[in-house]
């Protein structure tokens, strides 16, 4: 068995290889002047089981094409099973069918299967609907157990869902730690800007902990933090799985933000704390390989 790293998760792939005692391979990737990608794997792969590690985070489309080339090259080189570790599944927010727009998540699922992926491991999909798009085994690993040691240190706290999509995660954590819950109702206007309209639960004088899967522009988290402060919150912290961070984000109202390393990030504010996903990936891979 061998581990092949894409451009987006080299450090994670290296750590997986060391922990699992599997040979690490880094493909040769070059770019033409028009930004076309050329990819070569200069290692024999005949009859080998392969683990490919690649998130499709920014630049999303480049990394997606790179991933397709990685899988296709490995398959043509004679790889047997191909396990794809895709910590962050880009385009998962576009999972709804429409007559007016494509459904990229379905297309990606189709491509991955046709190219030869035999098992997909991903972390905290934005929508659980994505799992139903695949005909191959898929492991949607939740990071909640990684959060628990940190959450247990908070006193006088309440777990808050910033929108409907976070409800299940919040309730799971609340049940595990026997902590009170609060729910924010979020609406979007015609410009797709979000507005917090209602809160269920008493946050006054409490240390609030927001739980979400993605921080991108930071609008939801910022407005949720502001809404909580308006309702008397003592402090606001956040646990967020994927640090997409594609725009200038405002985190002034938050005390601390915990994110995982599904996406390799640089130059983060001192308010950020990175939680490694290595333990849960190693556990899942050991169940498969």
Language model region names:
Residues 1-289:
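PRPP-associated nucleotide enzymes
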